[in-house]
Design a protein with these regions (language model features):
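Short helix-coil junctions and helix-kink-helix linkers
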Residues: 163-165
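Short, surface-exposed acidic
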Residues: 136-137, 167-186
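Catalytic cores of RNA-modifying enzymes
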Residues: 1-149, 176, 196-211
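Short alpha-helix boundary/capping motifs
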Residues: 186-187, 203
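Active-site-proximal catalytic alpha-helix in oxidoreductases
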Residues: 152-155
Length: 211
C-alpha cells in the first residue's frame, strides 16, 4: 500500500506499480494507523517532510500494534531528535515517546547533493524496530502528558515543574514514588524513568485514598 496526498502522483504511482501496489489518496497525518494489527502486519518506508515527520511518527508508533519494521528519511534535525538519548541536546518529548514503542537507529546521512534541486539541509535515514507489545507503555495517555509537561520546561528542575503543574497535580507524588531526584532536569531522565513516573501517576489516580 502506498499513501499519497497528491492525486496526480497517487494515480501515477498506481499506474507504475500496477498490481503490486495499492495507492491510497490520503494524508498520512489522517491515516488510521490502528489498522496495522498483529493480524495485519506491515513494513513501512517513507520520505517524510519536516512538518509531517514528528506528528506522524507520534501517532504511528503508538497505534500500529502490528508494525514489523520501519525506515524513514527525514531532515537530519528530526532524525537526531528521534535517536537521541538522555543528556543529549536533541533529547526531548519525541525521543522519549518514539523510543517507548520502538528502537530507532540512525543508519546514514544524505547530503543535499542527492536531490534536485538540492535542499539547504542534510537528511537522515533511520530504521525502527518496534518493541514487543508487552514492553510498551501501560498508560500511554499519562506518559504523553508527563513528557509534554516536562519538556515544555526542559531547563527547569523536575521538582519545580511538578509544583507548578495544574494539568498533573499528582506529578510531585509520582516523582517521589518513582525515586526520581527532584533536582534533575527532564533531559537527564531515561525513557524508563518517564514510564515509571506515568505508572505511579496511574496508581495515584486509580487509588487516590491509598496514596
Amino acid at each position: 500500500m502506498l499513501l499519497e496526498k497528491d492525486s496526480h502522483w497517487a494515480a501515477e504511482r498506481q499506474r507504475l506499480g500496477a498490481a503490486r501496489t495499492q495507492a491510497v489518496l490520503t494524508d498520512a497525518l489522517r491515516f488510521d494507523w490502528s489498522r496495522i494489527t498483529p493480524d495485519n502486519p506491515w513494513k513501512i518506508i517513507g520520505n517524510l517532510p519536516y512538518n509531517v515527520a514528528s506528528p506522524m511518527m507520534w501517532d504511528l508508533f503508538s497505534r500500529a500494534t502490528g508494525l514489523v519494521r520501519a525506515a524513514f528519511m527525514v531532515q537530519k534535525e528530526v532524525g537526531q531528535r528521534l535517536a537521541a538519548g538522555p543528556g543529549n541536546g536533541h533529547y526531548g518529548a519525541l525521543s522519549v515517546w518514539v523510543q517507548s514503542f520502538a528502537r530507532p537507529r540512525m543508519e546514514f546521512i544524505v547530503g543535499p547533493g542527492a536531490f534536485s534541486p538540492p535542499p539547504k539541509v542534510d537528511s537522515a535515514v533511520l530504521s525502527f524496530e518496534p518493541l514487543p507489545l508487552d514492553q510498551r507503555p501501560e498508560r500511554p495517555d499519562l506518559l504523553a502528558l508527563v513528557i509534554k509537561v516536562c519538556f515544555q520546561q526542559r531547563r527547569k528542575q523536575l521538582g519545580s515543574i511538578a509544583r507548578r503543574c495544574p494539568l498533573a497535580p499528582w506529578l510531585s507524588a509520582a516523582l517521589e514514588q518513582a525515586g526520581i531526584t527532584p533536582t534533575l532536569r527532564p533531559e537527564q531522565l531515561t525513557v524508563a524513568d518517564f514510564q515509571h513516573i506515568s505508572l505511579f501517576g496511574a496508581s495515584l489516580l486509580d487509588n487516590p485514598l491509598k496514596n
